[in-house]
Amino acid sequence: MQITSFHPPRRTLMGPGPSDVSDRVLEAMSRPTLGHLDPAFVGMMDEVKSLLQYTFQTQNELTFAVSAPGSAGMECCFANLIEPGDRVIVCQNGVFGGRMRENVERCGGIAVMVEDAWGSAVDPDKLQDALKAHPDAVLVAFVHAETSTGAQSDAKTLVQLAHQYDCLTIVDTVTSLAGTPLYVDEWGIDAIYSGSQKCLSAPPGLSPVSFNQRAADKISARTTKVQSWFLDLNLVMGYWGGEGKRAYHHTAPVNSLYGLHESLVMVQDCLLYTSPSPRDRFL
């Protein structure tokens, strides 16, 4: 049997992701491939960073797209912020809270679980009880909008609670970014990750992430190496940092980043965050 070119049928995608990709994004991805250190491509990377800062509503310098799907963005956050022996409170109300636990334990951390029924939001009172019971906890992790059930939790309140007990936060926004109000700086989120294939309507394969200065300081103060060479932010940001000469780290998925760039331009053009009532644009 001779295999010929694959021509996928047109579908209207109604699952939890991937979502439909616009012709604008598909066209952008078909443009000529550049070298991953080409000045034109590096300039586009800077634009992706700026557009992600807008979409996350943050000024975090440490904002970029991991060259892998959302699960790698999750692992990037946990691998960089957790050292062996760290106690981490994980809120689980669906499948992806369970994956957070897996990441904590694979990093050598100790996971303290706060369980809520699938389909319900994370209960802030339960989180507060766990924080009181474990004063040595250093991190709180939760899913903003649980893909497996559609339940959305009150991220602002959960982050505020964590900070009251001097914990950093890791927040999964794979489903919620660009689909529901999300204010990284205003809410004080320390580390956040998402995916390109949900509300951003770009193809799968990239994971937007952002880390504030508190998170960056914890990473800088590590006494052990990050488990993953590929996801070690101390190395990755030599490529994405945007200051001076770029250091080669890996070959970026050039055409996929063209697509993400175009989808983020479309988010910007929608004026999601425009006064006087930006939240109304999500309704």
State what each model feature region is.
Residues 122-178, 191, 199:
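Active-site phosphate-binding strand-loop segment of PLP-dependent enzymes
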Residues 184-197:
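Conserved active-site segment immediately N-terminal to the catalytic lysine
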Residues 273-283:
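Single conserved hydrophobic/aromatic residue that forms the stacking wall/gate
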Residues 1-38:
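N-terminal "arm"/small-domain region of PLP-dependent enzymes with the aminotransferase-like
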Residues 20-21, 197-272:
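Active-site C-terminal subdomain of aminotransferase-like
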Residues 82-98:
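Conserved PLP-anchoring active-site segment centered on the Schiff-base-forming lysine
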Residues 28-76, 95, 99-105:
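Conserved N-terminal alpha-helix of the aminotransferase class I/II PLP-enzyme fold
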